[in-house]
Structures are given as C-alpha cells and as structure tokens.
Amino acid sequence: MSILTVKNLSHSFGGRQILKDVNFRLLKGEHIGLVGPNGEGKSTFLNLVTGKLEAEEGNIEWAKRVRIGYLDQHSIIGADMTVRDVLKSAFSYLFEVESELNDIYMKMGELSDQELDDIMLDAAELQELLETNDFYMIDSKIDEIAHNMGIKEWLDRPAFDLSGGQRSKILLAKLLLEKPDILLLDEPTNYLDEEHINWLRRYLQNYENAFILISHDISFLNSVINLIYHVENCEVNRYVGDYDEFLRLKELKQRQIEAAYKKQQQEIQELEDFVQRNKARVATRNMAMSRQKKLDKMEKIELVREKPKPEFYFETAPSTSRLIFETENLVIGYDKPISKPLNLRMERGDRIAIVGANGLGKTTLVNTILGNIKAISGSISFGQNLAIGYFKQEEHYDNNNTPIDEMWEKFPSWEQFKIRTALAKCSLTTVHIESQMKVLSGGEQAKVRLCKILNEKTNILMLDEPTNHLDPESKEELKRALKEYKGGIFLISHEKDFYTDIATEIWNMEDFSLL
C-alpha cells in the first residue's frame, strides 16, 4: 500500500534549483534513510511533502486518513507549556473525543427515547475509541516515555526554559507518543546522549509503521533503515539496503556512467570526423547527413560536476604554558547550582571529551570556563598565551549577512578572493556563500562557523557538538583535522565514533552533576 506518492516535484529557492522532476513513493512499513550532502534539499523535501512549503511544480498525494508525525530541526514549543503539557498534547485528538462524549452525557436528560437510543450508539463508539487508544492510561504512558527518554525530572518544568537539546528530546517524546502512521525525523539524534540514542535505535528497529529519517550518524542510520533515498544535484535516487550498500551501489553506478560517457564521447568524435570529411562531397553527402541526424538525436550523457570536497586545516598559534586552566571548588549553574564543587585541570596537549546526558551542564561548564557565564562559586585560574577558538552548538542569524559578510566581520583585512577560497575549502559553493545565513541549512551554517575557527590562529579548541548537522564526508574530514591539530582540545560530543579517536581523556558530566 502506497502511503505517499510524489510525482514530478520541482522546487527552487532564491533562484537556486533545489529539486527537479523528483518522483518518490513510500510504502507501508518502509524504513527510509534520506541522505545527501549538506544543503542539497533533504529538509526541503520533508517540508514540501508535509505542506510546510508549497511546491512550484509537481503532485504530492498522501493516502486517506494517514496521520503524519514530523520532527524537524526548527520545531517550536509554546511559551506557557510545561513539559507534561507538551507530552499531553500528543493526545489532543483523544481529549477532543472525551469532550464530545461528555457533551453527549450532558444532553441525555433532555432527549426522547428514540434520540437517546441514537445518541447512545454514538457514545458507545466514542467510548470504544478512547479505550482502544488507552486514553485512561495516558499518564502512565507519559511517565514511561519520559523515563525512557531521560526527561522524567523535567515534567513539571516550563518547556520554554529548557535548552535546545532538552526541547528536542521533549518534541521527539511527544512525537513517539502520537504513534502516527508515518514518522518524519530530521536529525533526531543531534541532541541525544548515547544512552537515549540506543533507546531510539531499538524503538525504530521494532517500529511497524513507515518512517523517513534524515541522519548523519551512519552507525545509527545503518541499524534502523532498509532503503536509502539519496538527494543530490536536484535528484532523489532510490537504493535498496543500508548506507554502506548505498555507497557501494553509488560508486558502481558512477563507474558505469563514466564508462558510458567515455564510449559515447568516442562515438561522437568519430561521427563528427566523418561528417566534416564527407559533407562536401556529392558521393558521400547523404551518408554525412545521416550521421549528422544521428548526432542531433543522440541523448548526450553528462558527467555531473563533482562537488568540492571539504579540506579542513586549523591554523595554530604559538604553544601555551603547561597549564591551560584549573578550577578550584567550581560550582556552575544559573539561578541555582547544577554541579558539585569541581576541581579540574587541563594541561598543554590534553584532548578532553566531555560526555554525558543532555541537561547535565556540559555547555554550561564550557561557557563558565570561557567567562560567558558567572560561576555560582569557586574559581578558575588560567595559563599564559591562550588563543581559544570556540564553536557554539547553535547560532541564530537575525540579520541579512551572507557567509562572505560573516567572514569579513571576523577577518576585515582579507580580500574577497581569500574569503571565497576559505569558504570553498569548507565545501561551500558560490550559491551558498552568496546566500543569507538565515536561509542556509544547519550543516551549511555549521561549516561557515567552522571556517572562522579554522582560519583563526588558536592553540586551544573548545567545540560544543561540532558534528551536529555535518554530512558524513565533512565529519570525517573534521575528525582528521582534529587528530592532526597540535593544540589542546576541549570537545563536547555525543558521538562515540567521532570522539574516541581524538580524545586522550574523557570527562563524564554525570560524575560532576547534581541533576
């Protein structure tokens, strides 16, 4: 059974073609991974099929009465809702049924016997709907999912006051409670710690309905999907199997195209040579015209221009003193403490990975060390000659700056050619670097922020989830560059596959936190 059918879908943005003549079909029970480089249109595709964006051309048809659950990168939570309110909203349609049922009960005393018989049938149907959907177990369902997602202690807190990562976990929990006919998940693991990624992995492995998943976490992707749709060069192509099988088939397909292109180019050369040599001679003119017609009708094979590959290299400043920083009975938090007194020390050459569940204070610790947040108590002492490069987990762009503008603000003495070259080394095309930051994808924005740090002379890197939104190729290049970096590294990451080869020491925030 087809749940979603897409025919001849085309869409552009700001004069740039994103998707062209795309055809797509989703069948019941399919577990699809939607993959491709940053900025190629994966999130745009989901926004089009859900109606958040209106397609310029093409047809999108959903099966009747299908319920869609969509977790995107920019979901919004109401300002006055507690976490429990957000999770309860997953059952809003059942609360509407309950309200309708209560209205029926209120009317019963005013009805004739015949009207009462009719309305009792309606009431029985509504009551059955509530019981079938476990309406009277909603609170226990909320408690169960909150426990599994590690958010139980937040249930009565205002959702708007939580961090971006915490809110993402809440929205994911709400989506799973809704149990839609299809899940659309846009990078759901970005803000999940290892424990809850594993829980989500098991959940999706056993999920009976269909889902479409965008993820740059390849080990996670491979463990839950059975089909790949690859988005690149305005096309969406289908591959059966996991991500590793997709890479093998894609490479095989590319070699076949290149071989066919080479063969066709040779044929074209031979035909053109024949036409040139024989079109003027009366005896061979007809044969030359025949060859020319063949050339004119030939469907030319075009090799797709290869996208620029990322080339990351961190500029370095002279070495620091032996001590980088040391804390004495440091307590971090905002209005109240969230950590035990911390006595931490980082020295030259240390490469420290900060791990642990969301909401324990990893980002707060980094911001306190950097002086962006005042400590509750305790002190921090620093070494000499520190040149720190800081990568924030998220950045919001309210102005009309392009990537070129962002780089110029950081490096005002640079010529435009140098700026464009630096951005190109982060695999950003001319279209990307001339677009406004606020319209770029999360991955493209991350590459611009990374480009600033790459070209800043540093001897300490403080990186808060730098792999969020990065495509696999960029992630691997970043890992390589960090392994070669000569300075100290203070890295927050939830991706064990990423930080294991980089870190010389691992600090688990659960050992430090009061939460």
Explain the meaning of each model-derived region.
Residues 1-259, 308, 317-515:
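ABC ATP-binding cassette signature C-motif
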Residues 249-301:
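Intracellular alpha-helical coupling/juxtamembrane segments of multi-pass membrane proteins
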Residues 312-314:
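Post-kinase regulatory C-tail/linker adjacent to protein kinase catalytic domains
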